[in-house]
Amino acid sequence: MWTPNVNIFRDPRWGRGQETYGEDPHLTSLMGQAVVRGLQGPESAKYRKLLACAKHYAIHSGPEWSRHVANINNVSPRDLWETYMPAFKDLVQKAKVREVMCAYQRWDDEPCCGSTKLLQQILRDEWGFKYMVVSDCGAIADFFTTHKSSSTPQHAAAKGVIAGTDVECGFGYAYAKLPEAVAKGLITEEEIDKHVVRLLEGRFELGEMDAHEECEWSKISPSILSCKEHRQLSLEMARQSIVLLKNEELLPLSKKQKIAVIGPNADNIPMMWGNYNGTPNSTVTILDGIRAKAGKKNVTYLKGCDLTEECVVNSFLTQCKADGKKGIRGTFWNNTTRSGKPVTTEYYVNPIAVTTSGQHTFANGVRMEDFSAMYETTFVPEKSCKAVIRMQYTGAFSLKVNGKTLAADSTWRDQPMRFELDVEKGKTYDVELAYHTVKTWGANMKLNIGEELPIDYNETIEKLKGIETVVFVGGISSQLEGEEMPVKIDGFKGGDRTHIELPKVQREFIRHLAEAGKKIVFVNCSGSAIALAPEAERCAAIVQVWYPGMEGGTAVADVLFGDYNPQGKLPVTFYKSSSQLPDFEDYSMKGRTYRYFSDPLYAFGYGLSYTTFKNENIKIEKQPAGDSSLFTLHSSLKNTGKREGTEVVQVYVRRCDDADGPLKTLKAFERVTLKPGETKKVEIKLDEEAFTLFDPDTNTMRVVPGKYEVFVGSSSRPEDLKKLNIILN
């Protein structure tokens, strides 16, 4: 299984940062190790449950749009060893990860999947990795197509294998040319053999060569999928991840009060999943969760606006006819060629939105894979105007109007498209959309014909008369940020973002709500940090919920209405604006993350609660020689509020005599749950790793003696920390 992604989320513009565990090396390492151990099973077992994969090795965190041509050549030794490498090293040496995926880009002029320094010298010789390396998909083909480090597929294949890449994933299939590479003398069969051995060893570890019943993991029943216990775990994960960023005594909400729920993510199922997601058999949206908690009669729902578009679509489907019926006719076949007798025919008078996600089908009797459809209608406009055909799809399509092909394409990513038509009143327009699935990709289709009209903010606000509190559910989604996407919208490029502000239409909507005197709870959904400076002024409460998963709607409602006390802490820095960010393509850590940046809107490690805590009597003791720890921190943490709550005690370290070093670096943390008025003793040990830093004098990572500052508190903000001074001999 190609997870976990332990790249460092160094820049919030990176679309795949949502897959990672944040911007901190220590946190990323701990989370990555836990994932590997959970996926592979105990080391003492005869067989592995599966083979986890540490990716993308190494120094890989965007931009998506340049990853096939990029040459990362400005990484200092300090950044390499203190920031980019620690998680990979720990997953190899501590968690015994069985696979490592090499990245697309070049590092110091060599493609990562062809770098002997990365794959042999560091990974195998220094760290002792003895398992398999897999290329990112298509990375070997990049050698001769984009990087131009190889002139032929044969040379690329030999280079990849000799450098240490055991498995080629994906497009181009250079390794299919290995027999030709052998014939040309570029590589020997003996050199190939050791890589084949590694692949076979992986299969042996999975029990593939033994009797099925001998492997304990083969006895896991499919019936556990989406079982009650797993859904409860999904709910608890979502609850614990929610971060309360601001609360002017508006939260928790009363279940008896009238509220409005507005925003593009309130009832957005795909947003809940994020990217590289499993497909749940059901999903609780945030609107679902709020309605279940407060009752439908107390909740007024208006979508208000889309994620990015500053318009709404007035649908013309009632001006369309097929077989004498209003709307669009959809005809379906259980093959991809639209041949033979159709399975069924359906008619749509509302915009089409169908998917195979969550075990759904496009229509009754239509299977989930290997099917096709034809959507047809005759559109007779009631007025002359600029109409639009809007669609969003996964699979392959061909769109025709009056027999003329407007577009034809296929994609495995959910791709939006828009086509303008200058239509005349009373004229006939025959619209035909042919669709079929491709390979085993999921299938999605949205289709509408209409007119784009500017958003009328005042009309929406008029509908909210008598409602004081508005829950605005906005942000972005994995349909805008993700891996190498064809998105071309202001603020987004190729899966990344070009600026980190909230999309303009949402910012304007919140401004109008605030000016109308509404008390706003802003629920922000995103896989990355959003610059929320204006929203922090206009909203009484801000809740960061990320992409919260199949039970996310229940989790969000639990927090909003006080059935769960938020305890999440930010794993990334929330900047005030895009102007605070360095060049996206610059991999230097200077000015990035809490370790080298000191003026955030919301700091790394920050997160509020419905109760309050006080950490007192903080002291640090040096441990005797021979102890596994160098120092032990002691403190007394008290819940000074009226609700049970959980605080995360965080410990940061800074070396005083290191002018170029980080401002502080997370080295330990402890999660503590307390009842109202309860006090607990907290003890946190700091071992050699807490003081293992890059030493510019020796150009190595080692325990560096000298003066240190140790910070203890509830976030990385200076005002949330207490400082202790120590000397390490």
Place the predicted regions along the sequence by residue.
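Short, structured beta-strand-loop surface elements
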Residues: 722
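Glycoside hydrolase catalytic-domain context in secreted enzymes
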Residues: 1-696, 700-718, 727
